[in-house]
């Protein structure tokens, strides 16, 4: 039987209430919090759970992430997540993931749902020094009078409040328009009954109005001001049965859809005629008039706990998103931590398809898998592709490039680095490969697997980042996977393109 990693509502609220003392301990030197944008090498899996299996989950196999949200922009889906890796880097695999050292958010994106580009982290504590921690983001975008698309990224400022960052790009730079939380546990309409004002969920409806939900152990909804960084009018309750956390909002066919995490109780007091939900599952409610409390109708649960799908039992958090005509559910499990030889509660973001009937606003029961979703378009090898775009990795970490959201792949000492990409379509025969890299060693390109047929072998011998071109050892066409195998010392890999 799987060991359950269960936090009761009382324990969850206690953790939130203790965040201030945790932060004071950290500042006093009990545990340093890493503040750079790279993924430091602490312990990495000897074998990636994705490299040889063909699995698509988790989205990133080299770091821990959780509590996903997403937004579409220019044909790509951008996913934002809690940076569990920062907690892991601060305490190691033998501590407990109690989230107190997490002061950043993770960014990644994809145009094919298989190869994911890691854009680095948002250092929330540098942008907004007044925050305590940053968890569970939710994002919305809109085009404004200046002709630019503006992004509004809300996140939990510990358990006590919800903060917001803004940008005119999905990868930043980000700024804090306020010097305090947008709402907290002292805000009228939240104060008193709600012990936590966190886990925000945001949506913009078809009239251009923004809406925000928050809460832990209770749920609150508010209309946002025209500036998206203020509250317009009263904050109203949503009477969500057995509410725990993980609020999100969608707007489907003129209906407001509120999703949340059901608690760990036995439901002997379940107040509705509907089927009782499963423990710590995800459920949803609907309304046409969101500020009218009685208008909210509970529907049913649409995703069980990860433990009910064969993973470890854990807290639960999802985001529903329609992309390229398909509905997806983003969620987290704790499957990756076993590759890191830890059971301390570190999470990883995954995605699977889910069926949503938009006419009836019915969300069918979803599934959680290691396999994940199908690739929705092939990768084009004849345009510049970034080394931080991966389907699977092993023995590499990522550090900042020269521009915001640009990363370099760097080999880990005493390990062969591997970067795999999938579904690469050669619709013509290439003659050469150009890479940008530095260091000393060899970058091999192999077909399908890390020990597959060698397509190209490029010698790297330069301390400065440099374009290097090489003829191919093998002619090929068709669709295939590629593995970039990095052998040598201090290889830094930026980009590649076939010609």
Feature map (PLM): residue ranges:
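Bacterial Sec-dependent N-terminal signal peptides
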Residues: 1-30
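Carbohydrate-active catalytic/glycan-binding domains of CAZyme proteins
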Residues: 29-457, 461-499
